[in-house]
Amino acid sequence: MPKHGRDGATEPGVAGRALDQDRAPSGRNAVLRAVGLVGVVVVWFVIAGLGGPAIGSLSSVQSNDQETFLPAGAESVAASEAARAFDDSGQLPAFVIFETDGGTASPDQLAAWGAYTESLAAQPVLTGRDGSLGTVGDYLVDGPPGRSVPVPLIPSEDGQAALVIVPLSEDKVTAVAADGQDALGDVVDALRTAGDAAAAGGSVHIAGPAGLIADLGAAFAGIDGLLLLVALSAVLLILFLVYRAVALPFVVLFTSISALAMAGGIVYLLAKNDVLTLNGQSQGILFILVVGAATDYGLLLVSRYREELTRVESTWTAITRAWRACLEPIAASAGTVIIGLLCLLLSDLNSNKGLGPVGAIGIASSFVAALTLLPALLMAGRWLFWPRIPRVAEHLGGAHAITHRARPGLWEKISVFVVRNPRKIWVVTVIALAVACAFVPTLKASGTSQTDVFLTDVDSIAGQDALSEHFPGGSGNPVVIIAPEAIAPDVVAAVAGIDGISGEPAVVTAAGTGPQAAGAPPLVVDGRVQIQATLSAAADSEGAEDAVRAVRAAAHAVPGADGRVLVGGNTAVLVDTTDTSVRDLKVIIPVVLVAVLIVLILLLRSLIAALLLVAATVLSFGSALGVSALMFNHVFDFPGADPAVPLFAFIFLVALGIDYSIFLMTRAREEVAFHGPHDGVMRGLAVTGGVITSAGIVLATTFAALAVIPILFLAQIAFIVAFGVLLDTFVVRTLLVPAAAIDMGWFTWWPIRPRPTKHQLAQRRPVSVGP
């Protein structure tokens, strides 16, 4: 039995008997194990070969239509479903806006713009990778038998612009062809090309839902190539700096790429069969999560493997010990992230629900690859570490000792500094982080307009600006009200007086709502009519959202409404999305905290240590959010943020940020069992400092790569998570957590004090601390 000192730590000394379970394989067992390792590698090559092409096809199963993200119970969704009874053509309109260079349109310009509408259906469209030839008419909604749908030219009142609403068929332009692409972007390009030819000295823009979705698709087109290239290149560079080896960085990176192939293949199959919702944001986050997590897990395993190679000659024994030592912290880390991501299933937004399983699949793939493929590849031998090949160290100071070099390394110095000043360090750190938290209320996360979605100039936003300048702000995006025919006049009267509504709301007739519909009877379907009201402000503006809320309040208050009046439209979709995001924030965050706390208690077998890590991580998250608010408002000059930004940042920072504290405290618990609560934590920090810092830098770099996609949401997530991970790595895990744990002593590990296991007693041999 090992002897214990007065503080409960195991005293130096060699374990009574060495366990023989880790002996190097020989003879028949060696052959079987070699075959098994080769089999693992072959299986992963097959996975990479099958899953790799699926990564490039993920864009073909994306859905970036905001309405599809909302729950079926949202009023705007119910209104949209009801409106299909009045027009089942399934339009995805494109707004073609012609405008002059500042003066009134000349007769020649008006004639050219009018000719554009007449020849529009015959304009050629080159679609697909094979350049198949079609026409715009192939993608218009179907008109009455023998007749085409009219596409009129609508001049502006100021005479400086004209609007053409092109009724594209949503089913036709979004249908995925054999090459995995839809035709929307090509059709919009055809509309723009023909418009440029007909501008007659003016300018043309393509806006509306079709133009916006096409521009979103173009922005996310960089995910498959540019984002992966930037992320993988940055990670490879960091791995070279960390390992200073020729082959090892490629081994770790290949593991990450294989994990991505596995995750991409699974997500593609599930999205293709409508099991989950995938959008451009989820795809980008999937790539970053897999590359970052798989590399982090690989760093931890390789670090422990290298440590064991300084203790034993056999690479099999070294990888077996390293695998066993890393299994628990990596499993806890992956489990924490997966649980946090799956909490998104509680969201009422389908886009958030989709990200939950998408991200969980990515983390699970990273976990499996890091603990199967990477160990098999590492069995190639010590030469992978060339030119810094680890050698077995001399015995110094007993079986559990850690050797120190003549010149202490950086993390040895930091650990000594922390153990000498624990209370002062954690108090000062908490105060500094609390000051940063004070700026959280300044984060403007109440939503942004669609014109603020892009970080670069895009044509659909320029078109929306031109539309707002020359036409009523909500032109082309009316508020849609579905009401019983009997109370329709009362609803019209109630809505007409609302601030933010332009003109008199119109009841839809069989001839439409324009001048041609004057005197026509209303179109009645199942006892209901459709009313359209034009907003005076841009449909995606805060003023328009306020007007929609007022319309809902007024329409629902009409006698006889009784829940039968529905208010929808594009602006209503934005309102419902914002409201649902705020609700998700209040529901999901507490659930994530409780789930993470339970995982930590089970892992560390200590309520106090688990509470310490959760509290430190929440404080770190608040600090990151506060600093981000300052940067967004005063440096980057962002217009605001989506309500989902704080939620996603919380999920990633709490689930991923706590990883480093998990890695630290699991090793600290092992050391505390031998050296007590002070020296044990100090040694845990010294041994893990280099690898955890490298892992933090890798994860921060991969998330920062999201900024190459010119979308406001992704840029904000990139900054918050990258900064938060670095803050957690260099401040929380380095100073706050170890200082507080040392200051509380054995109480940190209440109620179950750490005790060494038989494997730990048998395996502890000296290892040099440092990179």
Name what the model sees in each region:
Residues 59-60, 93-94, 98:
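Short, conserved active-site loops that position catalytic residues or coordinate cofactors/metal ions
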Residues 64-65, 101-102, 399-400, 449:
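A short, structure-level motif marking secondary-structure boundaries and short turns
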Residues 1-63, 126, 171, 175-445, ...:
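Membrane-embedded transmembrane helical bundles of large multi-pass transporters/channels
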Residues 72-93, 102-210, 442-640, 770:
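Structured non-transmembrane domains adjacent to transmembrane bundles in polytopic membrane proteins
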